[in-house]
């Protein structure tokens, strides 16, 4: 008996002295001696490597992380974990499985999600900028600053509120709205239009994804388009995700050197006009906390069930001096933010056109005719301002800050978007089955 045990040990050692990928020979050896297969199995991935991989790629299950570490091990070191190789394997796997999942869920209806807004620059020059030497191009544009407003609004849908609150989905939304804000300046989309311009979704999907922060760059080993980033998240979360609509701020184009200047046209002298962006969102989740940048007071990145993006023009010969003094910037931002709050908080459908803005109960849906209920105290010219129409408050604000100019409108809202989640989606009776419908059907409840 002892002799047979020794012979068995010799066979086991001989089998394991070679790499485990022995082909037919190893198969023959493992059939009579099952324990030899166990001896030749590669070492399990370490818990540390699994945890690190899941941390680098949020939404990755423990089983998928283990599979990636095992499948990506090089033949030369089959027992060594490589995070870098595992990341490459995961990315390739998500591209393959994500495309299949996207096709599978394409017929579903996505009613949940968020409306996100981003302002990279609100267009308001600091006192330091105003005291410095402005570029000739900026002076000709009449915007009074070397940087114009840049921002965007986008609605991204998913199937359930659970996914809408997920951190992976939230990061996708942040990156997409950041990309939309940069889209006009990096593409040929802007053309002759200015203000808030719709961005074609099909063009956006083919556009490179521009991460919203350095930390958001992630672990991707190759550049992503917006479309491939969505497929990547679909592979992780298993729900249909789609962009319903998107719009971006297109800043005024710089005129040619021989173009008529605003000071020559009689409208306002160069540098006395600024067009500022403001945004607000209501009904957001904790997973998408509003982002701030202490070095950029005009920066906004937030989302909710309803959001607004507003463009406001300030035009006064006295504006450059006020901006150089540096005492009015915070007051102006409080006013523009108040306008964005007003647009989002009330059913605001237009700026001042009674024909297209019917009265809803006691409150008009025309911005200028509404009582300025969302006016922040920092911008209020008087204690009674919240009860006064928006148009009247804007006029009073200009006088209060010594910016009134020959009876002209110093402050004007020139463009705005107020988007509410799901308002462009067909009613439930006309829509296809959603994820919840499929769950009820699978459970025999439908």
Swiss-Prot record:
GO terms for biological process: mitochondrial translational elongation. InterPro entries: EF-Ts_dimer_sf (IPR036402), Transl_elong_EFTs/EF1B (IPR001816), Transl_elong_EFTs/EF1B_dimer (IPR014039), Transl_elong_Ts_CS (IPR018101). GO terms for cellular component: mitochondrion. GO terms for molecular function: translation elongation factor activity. It is found in: Mitochondrion. Transmembrane segments: none annotated. Keywords: Elongation factor, Mitochondrion, Protein biosynthesis, Transit peptide. Gene3D superfamilies: DNA helicase RuvA subunit, C-terminal domain (1.10.8.10), Elongation factor Ts, dimerisation domain (3.30.479.20). SUPFAM superfamilies: Elongation factor Ts (EF-Ts), dimerisation domain. It holds the Pfam family EF_TS. Residues 1-33 form a transit peptide. Belongs to the EF-Ts family. Associates with the EF-Tu.GDP complex and induces the exchange of GDP to GTP. It remains bound to the aminoacyl-tRNA.EF-Tu.GTP complex up to the GTP hydrolysis stage on the ribosome. This is Elongation factor Ts, mitochondrial. It comes from Mycosarcoma maydis.
